[in-house]
From Swiss-Prot:
Keyword flag Ribosomal protein: yes
Source species taxonomy: Archaea, Thermoproteota, Thermoprotei, Sulfolobales, Sulfolobaceae
Family (UniProt): Belongs to the universal ribosomal protein uS10 family.
Pfam family for this entry, one: Ribosomal_S10
Transmembrane intervals: none
Quaternary data: Part of the 30S ribosomal subunit.
HAMAP family to which the protein is assigned, alphabetical: Ribosomal_uS10
Function noted in UniProt: Involved in the binding of tRNA to the ribosomes.
The keyword Ribosomal protein is assigned to this record: yes
Protein name: Small ribosomal subunit protein uS10
GO CC terms: cytosolic small ribosomal subunit
């Protein structure tokens, strides 16, 4: 039977990501289970250069659009009660969660 659960979270909005992490931390502290993290993983930047003029004539002026994806990693002991409560956590639309049992 797995003894650990590795939770990976990622989002483009840091405030929503931290909100979900505080909810997970509250559940873990209530049950008294060992928790490691949140470990901040490297932020990936997606850059898209777009030419400002649609017809292509004149000076070439570029706009650069950027999207940052923030990632966190949490390791907790895999307890059945805690896993059920984690499934009930309300998660905003722009936060993605992946749970892996180790």
């Amino acid at each position: 039977m797995p003894t650990k659960a590795r939770i990976r979270l990622w989002s483009t909005n840091v405030e929503n990501l931290n909100y979900v992490i505080t909810q997970i931390r509250g559940i873990v502290e209530k049950t008294g289970i060992e928790m490691r993290g949140p470990i901040p993983l490297p932020t990936s930047k997606l850059e898209v250069p777009i030419m400002r003029l649609p017809h292509g004539e004149g000076r070439k002026k570029w706009e650069k659009w950027e999207m940052r994806v923030h990632k966190r990693l949490i390791d907790i002991a895999a307890d059945e009660r805690v896993m059920r409560q984690l499934m009930r956590v309300r998660v905003p639309e722009d936060v993605y969660i992946e749970i892996q049992l180790i």
